[in-house]
Design a protein with these regions (language model features):
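A preference for well-ordered globular domain cores
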Residues: 2-123
Length: 123
C-alpha cells in the first residue's frame, strides 16, 4: 500500500462530499529538502461508518481479501505438520499487526464519534 502525501495535517476520519468516508492512519510529518508535509495511509469507506467496517477495509487494502483465511489455513497446516513451523510465526506476526491496527481504528473511531456528538450538542 502506497503512502499519500499532503501539505497540511489530515483529519483521521473525514466525510467526503460524495457521501463516503476517508480513513487515514499512520500519519507522519515529512521534512526534507524537496517536501514538507505529511504522509499517511488512506482508505475509502462506504456508509454506514463503523469501526469494524473501517478495519475490514484497511485489512483488505493492506493484505488483500481472504488473506486472513489463507494465513489461518497455513497456521493450522503447520500445527498438523503439513507445513513447516515458520507458518506459525507468519500467522502470529499477522495477528499482532492486525491487533495494532484494530486498536488504532477503535481509538480513532471513538474520538470521531465523540467529536460528532460534541458538534451536535454545540449546535
Amino acid at each position: 500500500m502506497k503512502r499519500v502525501y499532503s501539505n497540511k495535517i489530515p483529519s483521521k476520519i473525514e466525510k467526503d462530499n460524495s457521501g463516503y468516508y476517508l480513513y487515514r492512519w499512520n500519519i507522519q510529518e515529512e521534512q526534507n529538502t524537496e517536501y514538507n508535509g505529511y504522509s499517511y495511509y488512506e482508505v475509502t469507506v462506504w456508509p454506514t461508518l463503523t469501526a469494524n467496517k473501517i478495519l475490514e477495509t484497511c485489512i483488505n487494502e493492506l493484505w488483500g481479501t481472504d488473506v486472513e483465511a489463507k494465513k489461518l489455513n497455513d497456521y493450522n497446516a503447520a500445527l498438523l505438520g503439513v507445513l513447516d513451523e515458520s507458518y506459525i510465526d507468519i500467522y502470529k506476526d499477522f495477528l499482532q499487526k492486525r491487533k495494532e491496527l484494530k486498536e488504532q481504528v477503535d481509538s480513532d473511531f471513538i474520538a470521531y464519534e465523540q467529536m460528532q456528538d460534541d458538534q451536535i450538542v454545540n449546535k
